[in-house]
């Protein structure tokens, strides 16, 4: 029990340090599904999002791999060439966003007939990465109607 209390105390200390690192009014926190911890991880790993014009999803390792030969085109999942920590952060955020973010929830419902399980959650993570890029790049809070 002492070990559990020590770990809880350490967790609170780390969360406090994260709050000092990232301003509370950062626009990433306007996105439903991205909380304090994951938001801080994403901001720390990405830095300035303006350096990504088109390749943010690839930097996160969530870009699709498409193989083509002749007339056939086959999708082979995600590349996994990007930042593994970011990929994991967006995956975890997507698990929550499916429940609380109306855009991700709608995306999930539209695609669950075609995709299953982890592939569908990964697709939601990619969508969440695109939303995160747009919010940070254009410096506008999340708006589900856009």
Model-identified regions with their sequence ranges:
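A detector of single, family-specific signature residues
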Residues: 1-146
């Amino acid at each position: 029990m002492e070990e559990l209390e020590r770990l809880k105390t350490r967790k609170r200390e780390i969360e406090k340090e994260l709050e000092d690192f990232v301003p509370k009014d950062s626009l990433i926190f306007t996105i439903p599904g991205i909380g304090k911890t994951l938001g801080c991880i994403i901001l720390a790993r990405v830095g300035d999002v303006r350096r990504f014009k088109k390749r943010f999803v690839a930097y996160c390792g969530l870009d699709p791999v498409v193989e083509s030969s002749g007339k056939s085109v086959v999708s082979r999942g995600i590349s996994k060439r990007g930042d593994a920590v970011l990929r994991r952060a967006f995956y975890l955020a997507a698990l929550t966003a499916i429940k609380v973010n109306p855009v991700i929830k709608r995306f999930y419902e539209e695609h669950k007939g075609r995709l299953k399980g982890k592939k569908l959650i990964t697709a939601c993570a990619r969508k969440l990465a695109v939303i995160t890029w747009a919010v940070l790049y254009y410096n506008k809070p999340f708006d589900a109607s856009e």
